[in-house]
C-alpha cells in the first residue's frame, strides 16, 4: 500500500508550534495531547478493506488475531480458533465485549462482512483464496478457503474488522471500529486527532488525546527541537543529534530497502491504464546479477543510515523462511565485471559505460523525493554502479508519478513483513503488475511452484524448505544467485526521538514503516514524570 509523507509548509509548522509551544507542553507534567510525528499518512484513508493496517496495527479497528511483542500469534477479537483437518476452514470464537465507541457490539456478522467485502474488492488485501466467511452464531465465525494456505494467519492478524452497519463510501475518512482509539478529526496533510474508545476491552490508554502531525522530515525535526512533539520518527542520519529533554530510540526491524528491476524488455506494451511496461537494460540478467555482485551494502548502511542498520541480501534476512544461500554477498567488482563481459557487455567507445547491441548499460532509478534515506541510498547505488560501467540516472518523484513509471524503470522500494506471504506478492507471477506488488512483471514457473507447495504445506515448519527453494533451489530462484529480480540494499533500524518522560514499553521487531508500527502498543504508553 502506498502511503504518503505530505509536505508540511513552514507556515503551518510555525502556526502549529504556537498552539503546542514548549511552554504549553511543559506547563503540566503530562501534555494535554500527546503529539507524535511518525509520518505515514495513508493516502487512501483508514479503511482496512482497501489496505489500511496491512502491516499491522489498524488503530481504530480490532483484528481477529494479532502478533504479540515476541511475534507469537495470540487472540484479539478471537478467544479461540481451530483449523480443519483439510486445512481449509478456520473456526473462531469471538469475544462478546468488543464494542464501538457508541456502545454498539461487534459481532461475527461484522467479521464475515469484512472478509467477504475485502475478497470482492480485489484490492491490496489479497483474499482471492477465500471461498466464504460466515457467521454461525453471534460470536462464532467460519472462514472457508478454496485451497490450503499456510500464511492465511497473516490475514487474520492484519485485517481490521469493520462494522457492517457503519460501512459505506466515506468510511475511509470516518473510520469506526472496536479498536483502542476513535477518530476525532483528520485534516488531511496536517494532522490526525484520536481519543480512546471508551468501550475498549484491552489496556486503557494513558492519554486522553493523541495528535499525529503529518509533514516533511524537516518539519517533524523542528517540532521535536521546539518541544512541540513527544515522539518523532527521524532519519538515521539525524538520530544521534538528540534534542534536550529527549532520548534516542532504535528499534530493530525487517523493514528493508531495495531496487526493483523491470524484468521484461521494452516491446511497447502498456498497462490497462496506459503506463509503459518493460526495460531492455534491466531485463538483461547480467545487469541485475552484476549489480548484486558489485554493491557494497555495508558502505550503503554507513552512508545512508549512519551505521544504524544492516546490509540486506533478500526480502527476509534472518527470518525463519530466509535462504541465506540464495544470494551473493556483494562488494566484488571483479566478479561483476566478469559477469557483464560474459553477458556480452563491452565499453567499445571508451566512455566508461558498457554497451551491448547498440544499447548503453544505462537506466533510470526512481525514488520518492520526500524520503531523504531513499535518496541517499539511490545516490550511493549510482556511484557504485559507475565502477562497473553501468550508468544509472537518479530521479526523485512523487508516488503518483512513480506509479505511472514503475513498470518501465527501476524503483527504490521499501517492504518488510512478519509473513513469508510478502515474498509471493513481490515475486509471484499472479501479482505481476498488481499495484506496487511485482511491478517488474517477474515470472518464473519454478518459483511459482515452490510458493504453491509452501502454501499447501501441513504446517508452517513444513513450509520452510519451499519458501527457501523459491529463493534458490540450486538451479533457479528469485534471489541474486538466480534471476536477481531485486538488488536488496539495507535493513533499517527505525529511529525516533522520544521525550524523556514518555515510556513506550517493549517494541516488536517492526515491519515496514507503513501503518504507524511504533504505535502498535500505543494504549500501553505512559507519562512517567510527576
Give short role names for the model-derived ranges.
Residues 154-209, 218-219, 226, 333-338, ...:
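Gly/Pro-rich hinge or "lid" segments in bacterial periplasmic/extracellular proteins
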Residues 29, 85, 93, 123-166, ...:
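Surface-exposed binding/hinge segments that line
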Residues 38-55, 77-79, 104, 152-160, ...:
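A structural "hinge/loop" feature
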Residues 195-198, 255-287, 303, 492-493:
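A bilobed periplasmic-binding-protein/Venus flytrap-type ligand-binding module shared by bacterial periplasmic
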Residues 197-244, 391-393:
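Ligand-site clamp/hinge motif
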Residues 28-29, 187-191, 196, 256, ...:
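Detector for C-terminal structural segments
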Residues 35-85, 116, 176:
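N-terminal lobe/hinge region of extracytoplasmic solute-binding protein
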Residues 79-122, 142, 223, 280-283:
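Aromatic- and charge-enriched surface segment that lines or borders ligand/interaction sites
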